[in-house]
Amino acid sequence: MKSRLRLPILLLALACPALFAADAAAPRWNILFVFADDWGRYAGVYAGIDGKPSLNDAITTPNVDRLAREGVAFRRAFVNAPSCTPCRSSMLSGRYFFNTGRGAILRGAIWDSAIPTFPLQLRDAGYHIGKSYKVWSPGTPADAPFGGQTHAYEKSGRAPNNFSEEVTARVAGGMALAAARDEVLAQVRGNFDAFLADRKESRPWHYFLGVTTTHRKWVKGSGQALWGIDPDKLKGRMPAFLPDVPEVREDVADYLGECQAVDAYIGVLRARLEAAGELERTLIIVSGDHGMPGVPSGKCNLYDHGTAVSLVARVPGAKGGRVVDDFVCLPDLAPTFLEIGGVKPPAGLYGRSLLGILRSDRSGQIDPTRSWVITGRERHVENAREGYVGYPMRALRTADFVYIRNFRPERMPMGDAKTAFDPKVLAGNTLTEETRVGFADMDASPTKEWLVRHRDDPRWKRHYDIAFGPRPAEELYDLRKDPDQVNNVASDPAYAKIRGEMGADLMRRLTEAGDPRVTGDGLTFEKPPFAGPVIEESANEGSSKKASRKAKN
């Protein structure tokens, strides 16, 4: 009898080796991951952590805050690259963004299927996996690191990607605001329920909700109309790089409203977990792919406003109410999820597992070696500059300083002005609606338009220069004195020693990591396929394109 059982088991092991490779000591929790486009470090929990006036004073996120009370909030969580596709390439693989082939750029990205990613590795280790909306995009094939659309659950609807547009349209059609919101939230619930219903037996699962809600565009005035966020409450709380004027405050309030929509989605998913009896065996973790879009120092910048993100987790069986000061970079999530699933991480990872920190009962600095992160970017919008080239940057962030190396300071950081100053452009609201008119590495927005219109006003010229002006080869910011990173002290003799040390440390780490920007001839990213015109991807971007009406940048 035993010999007859051994043969089929042996054949199954040979056919599906990954199913038998899982570490028996691994927790094998379910993993619920909410990952929002352009969601920076904005949640109510951070207002208390920051300890000073900030934009977080104006946002209400009861569901994220509850996760933090029951789990852990990371004070120093950063993306590896503040641009959608390269950030996701890095996060999904656990590698530096510059080690992901054509995944290192935005427009023109093509996924290298030879690079392992945590969702597919979990699938091969016996997890039931599923996703709704955006995982990896723009790029070809869309969502390739998650298996494309094979594991998509979106039949209940895609309205959650465009919360303010969808709810505003329903209200304009005569629906009550509460009913309109509930109708959109029902689609989040329906897609997740369909995913859970598909699970075979009691297999562990991983679900990825990738909403584009917080990506522009959104409805002007929606922060107050839909969420009651008063733009005037932001007065005196704006960071130094943002003009503290009504137009910009309203724009920021609208963004915070979309962040609150993401919080509502998190609440829906948590409620479904409780109803299904799955809450206490599920890791819930929430974050975003970079900072605020369409504003100075945000998306596509290596200042904290561009690279710092929310990261909050509820961990089964762990102590809640913790705030961790360790530096965390989103590539750390891949080895974390793999360790939870009992999967051996592949070689070549930059990220390090956070499982020990998640299970710890301590706050503050837990791992003393987690004292820095590296961030960077290459090309974002392909035609932002003449020659279809990017604006290469790398940065080293520590507790007290941010050091930035701009490898091509002769280029414009947000792209060429193009027709941004054309009277015909300024006659309307083109800079609010069309990103590629000028400075294309900053999303179209009311803030962008306001800055361009006030570029010659002495009161606001510094804000304009921070947003669009040229930058030197080196930048250094003393966070103890300048938390908003607006006073570059790289040329100050008093900082010569720290500038030299951080510059050398950054270059050493990049060289050790095999960054093509600093190894070989250093020109890899200056040549096709990383530079030059992009042939428009066709059907390969299909689902992600359908999933959202947001711009693909």
Protein language model features and the residues they cover:
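A glycine-rich phosphate-binding loop feature that marks nucleotide/adenosyl-phosphate handling sites
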Residues: 522-526
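Formylglycine-dependent sulfatase
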Residues: 11-15, 21-475, 483-504, 518, ...
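Bacterial N-terminal signal peptides that target proteins for export
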Residues: 1-9
